[in-house]
Amino acid sequence: MSVSETRDLFDRWELVWHEDRHDLVPACVGPTYVRHEAAGERTVTGESYAAELARMKEARPGVRVAVYDHVFWDNRAWFRFTFNWRDPETGKPRTQAGMQSYRIEDGKLAETWIVLQPEGSAWPDAVAQERWTSPPPYKR
C-alpha cells in the first residue's frame, strides 16, 4: 500500500472520528478488525465498531484526537496522540495520551494495537498536527 493510499485512509478515518461520518466506516474498516487493548484482544466488525464509537462519544462529549507524530510504511501506520474531551458532569477538560499502531489489509484497517496512559495524561508537545496526516509542527 502506498503512503498516499494510507494517508487517504486515515483522512477518511479522521472524518469518522471528528465529523461523525459513520457512513465512511465501511470504506475504512475491513470485514473484521482485530483490536489489541489493555483488556485483551477482541475482533469487531465495522458496524459494531461504529456503534461502539457512538457510545464512546456520548460518554466523552466533543472528543477530539490530537495527533503529535505519525509514521506510514508499507501496510502499517503508527500514531502518538491525546484524546481531549469535556467531562459531561463538570464540563472540565479531560485528556488521555496514547499510542496506536495499525495493520492495513486491502486498503482497510484490519488490526490495531493501542496503549493508553491514565486519564488526565497528555503529551508535553505544545502544538499538535493540523490534521492526523499533516506533517508534525516541528522541523525534523
Feature annotation, model-predicted:
Residues 5, 9, 50-140:
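A beta-strand edge to alpha-helix "cap/lid" segment located at domain peripheries
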Residues 47:
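Hydrophobic small-molecule pocket/channel-lining residues, especially in calycin-type beta-barrels
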Residues 32-44, 56-59:
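A short gly/proline-enriched turn/hairpin at secondary-structure junctions
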Residues 1-32, 43, 130-140:
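Short, low-complexity N-terminal intrinsically disordered segments enriched in polar/charged residues
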Residues 25-27, 36-37, 65-66, 112:
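Short, hydrophobic secondary-structure boundary micro-motifs
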